């Protein structure tokens, strides 16, 4: 097939200069063209000839190539697609230039509209000439009977990652003369959709031809059949009328909801509609739970009864959904409602201007309701400034003035809200039928859990252990129970639940678990939103019991503090602790004699083990439970985090804040636990996308680790980051929530890095004024200049095998009572060594020193390895 040459000449922009694309590398990428059937090849030839006539492509001899293919649309016509994924990987992506869809209720009430659509916007915007060879493709010839015809795009191709952003920037630049010529005109732009709005129709009639002329000069043409000139029109999926905005009718189909991808699309549509809907977030949770589980887009999902009921609520709400157009001369208010589980808010001016909802998946396991209201109010204030350019004059919340003062004194979120909002805070809602949906909910304010001990309340001490034994002490009586749990926190929660059910009178609870104390204090006015969490069910039961009982005071006492157990707050806790550890269970004469021996001689754990045929763990527990012996136990070294025995085995990662870096204050830090090599990235946030960016930068510099340990931050536990780790074949582990000791190595690295930034700033501030440069200098010092006791830097340790003891030992297999060795020591630890067992035969059946093995290992360094 030979294309016909055409001179029809697609006229690229007469004014606009093509924007160059930033590239990571200039190396050509060649992906061979896929095989196409004769039917598809014929369609490709026809579509390419059309693009050639329109001037969208040129013949090419580019060293780049990526495949093209065609798909048949429902109408029966073919669509040409270009697989540009390899090219997208080579380019630096532009940042977002538009934060989201414009809120149409911000359009003034009663103004006239003109709505237009730019025709073939991508194909009207030129590519920079130096970038065009990268977007080349090939039309294969049948049976290779002639050279293949090759072409490259002259305009923005579909499928290029930067095409949407470049389109927005290009059209925005083309509209600048219109904005300057008619400053009183409201002009909304989203991709290729444009809305003009003005109070006077004559002004629109003057602006419209000027707009057409300007767009034409930039090579942009409008679709004349889609122009809407009226006070009512369709724009961005909504019907805009003089006094209200109504979403277009959306049909929710249920027959195709079978996979995760189906639900992702459905929930995307619902999320787009949420500003129109007054449905509280809690009523949509059965739908958003479908996003959990298997992350593969084709993983099966089944529509449940609760999810179907949620869809029915959405359909019912859509029938009456509308937003009011704002009246510029009138003020508006922000109303925050006490809806079930999580609050709901609305910007109000004789009707809803914009519904505001909290995040469907909060970062915390327990959301305290008063804090959730303050956070949503702050979100509403930000939305008012963003979309309407001014703050509401009135904030309406479900709390009295006295309650607001109490919350401002005890809650950080309320303190920020009260000090940042200059208007009036009230609790009287407008009288309107739309707002009646929230009036049936009771005001959520803490009344059961008090902040001071109850003088007339009984005192109960609780404790739980990892053996599943939970106990509480009341009036000197010890009650213990075995639970089917192996987590001390879970057992402690179950014990507290048992106490709340048993003692209905005013109650003081003393627990040695700070986690449980904080949880109980939050649960009366909070909500657990993690159905996948094991503790969520227990929290819900505790919450139900709290809401139907007398006041409770719960406090924390530190266990094993070394203080005399005669102290009032410690005697009961000591009894509960002994009950969970077996200290109160000695009853037989033999056990009594053993206790006398223990309390008299205080011998070592090894002696107890040999004397009473105990295991090592049981013997050590006896020593640690002894009040006299525990004071003299060896203190473990602070560096108890698991470390890799060689580089790239175990990394730790965390985020610290350096306020002097400004917008780049979120400093992501990774450290290799074996070599100590450190990498840091100053970024603008700490979301999953920022964490992934840091990982890619760190791994490209120092290599990819096998295991990555982080804390339980929302970015690290997100589905997006978990999927990234699986794709990169990196095992991701998290530590205990709210326990930074599990990431002690990277926490110490934070302090070290900040120390060097401060020290070097004094000497190098004039030479290295930029934050990135000062950070690089600190990392260079830590990685390449600082040496250990052996004279090695972190970079040298990272790039070489760690030194191992050159020793051989014999060792005994206690299961078979046989001695083996001598075998080499891999690594020494405190009280133990790791030995590499060189077995007599290998997994391949060769003898240890056989000729076959010698042939297989020829040229391989003589280091221990598994065979």
Curated annotation (Swiss-Prot):
<dbReference type="GO" id="GO:0003964">
    <property type="term" value="F:RNA-directed DNA polymerase activity"/>
</dbReference>
<keyword id="KW-0255">Endonuclease</keyword>
<keyword id="KW-0695">RNA-directed DNA polymerase</keyword>
<dbReference type="GO" id="GO:0008270">
    <property type="term" value="F:zinc ion binding"/>
</dbReference>
<dbReference type="InterPro" id="IPR001584">
    <property type="entry name" value="Integrase_cat-core"/>
</dbReference>
<dbReference type="Pfam" id="PF00078">
    <property type="entry name" value="RVT_1"/>
</dbReference>
<dbReference type="Pfam" id="PF00075">
    <property type="entry name" value="RNase_H"/>
</dbReference>
<keyword id="KW-0378">Hydrolase</keyword>
<feature type="binding site">
    <location>
        <position position="512"/>
    </location>
    <ligand>
        <name>Mg(2+) 2</name>
    </ligand>
</feature>
<dbReference type="InterPro" id="IPR002156">
    <property type="entry name" value="RNaseH_domain"/>
</dbReference>
<dbReference type="GO" id="GO:0035613">
    <property type="term" value="F:RNA stem-loop binding"/>
</dbReference>
<keyword id="KW-0233">DNA recombination</keyword>
<protein>
    <recommendedName>
        <fullName>Intracisternal A-particle Pol-related polyprotein</fullName>
        <ecNumber>2.7.7.49</ecNumber>
        <ecNumber>2.7.7.7</ecNumber>
        <ecNumber>3.1.26.4</ecNumber>
    </recommendedName>
</protein>
<dbReference type="InterPro" id="IPR000477">
    <property type="entry name" value="RT_dom"/>
</dbReference>
<dbReference type="InterPro" id="IPR012337">
    <property type="entry name" value="RNaseH-like_sf"/>
</dbReference>
<dbReference type="InterPro" id="IPR043502">
    <property type="entry name" value="DNA/RNA_pol_sf"/>
</dbReference>
<dbReference type="InterPro" id="IPR001037">
    <property type="entry name" value="Integrase_C_retrovir"/>
</dbReference>
<feature type="binding site">
    <location>
        <position position="193"/>
    </location>
    <ligand>
        <name>Mg(2+) 1</name>
    </ligand>
</feature>
<keyword id="KW-0238">DNA-binding</keyword>
<feature type="binding site">
    <location>
        <position position="577"/>
    </location>
    <ligand>
        <name>Mg(2+) 2</name>
    </ligand>
</feature>
<dbReference type="InterPro" id="IPR003308">
    <property type="entry name" value="Integrase_Zn-bd_dom_N"/>
</dbReference>
<dbReference type="GO" id="GO:0044826">
    <property type="term" value="P:viral genome integration into host DNA"/>
</dbReference>
<feature type="domain" description="Reverse transcriptase">
    <location>
        <begin position="52"/>
        <end position="240"/>
    </location>
</feature>
<dbReference type="InterPro" id="IPR036397">
    <property type="entry name" value="RNaseH_sf"/>
</dbReference>
<keyword id="KW-0511">Multifunctional enzyme</keyword>
<dbReference type="InterPro" id="IPR017856">
    <property type="entry name" value="Integrase-like_N"/>
</dbReference>
<dbReference type="GO" id="GO:0046718">
    <property type="term" value="P:symbiont entry into host cell"/>
</dbReference>
<dbReference type="GO" id="GO:0006310">
    <property type="term" value="P:DNA recombination"/>
</dbReference>
<keyword id="KW-0229">DNA integration</keyword>
<keyword id="KW-0808">Transferase</keyword>
<feature type="binding site">
    <location>
        <position position="654"/>
    </location>
    <ligand>
        <name>Mg(2+) 3</name>
    </ligand>
</feature>
<feature type="binding site">
    <location>
        <position position="711"/>
    </location>
    <ligand>
        <name>Mg(2+) 3</name>
    </ligand>
</feature>
<dbReference type="InterPro" id="IPR043128">
    <property type="entry name" value="Rev_trsase/Diguanyl_cyclase"/>
</dbReference>
<feature type="binding site">
    <location>
        <position position="192"/>
    </location>
    <ligand>
        <name>Mg(2+) 1</name>
    </ligand>
</feature>
<keyword id="KW-0479">Metal-binding</keyword>
<keyword id="KW-0460">Magnesium</keyword>
<feature type="DNA-binding region" description="Integrase-type">
    <location>
        <begin position="807"/>
        <end position="862"/>
    </location>
</feature>
<feature type="binding site">
    <location>
        <position position="117"/>
    </location>
    <ligand>
        <name>Mg(2+) 1</name>
    </ligand>
</feature>
<dbReference type="GO" id="GO:0003887">
    <property type="term" value="F:DNA-directed DNA polymerase activity"/>
</dbReference>
<feature type="site" description="Cleavage; by viral protease">
    <location>
        <begin position="592"/>
        <end position="593"/>
    </location>
</feature>
<feature type="domain" description="Integrase catalytic">
    <location>
        <begin position="643"/>
        <end position="802"/>
    </location>
</feature>
<dbReference type="GO" id="GO:0004523">
    <property type="term" value="F:RNA-DNA hybrid ribonuclease activity"/>
</dbReference>
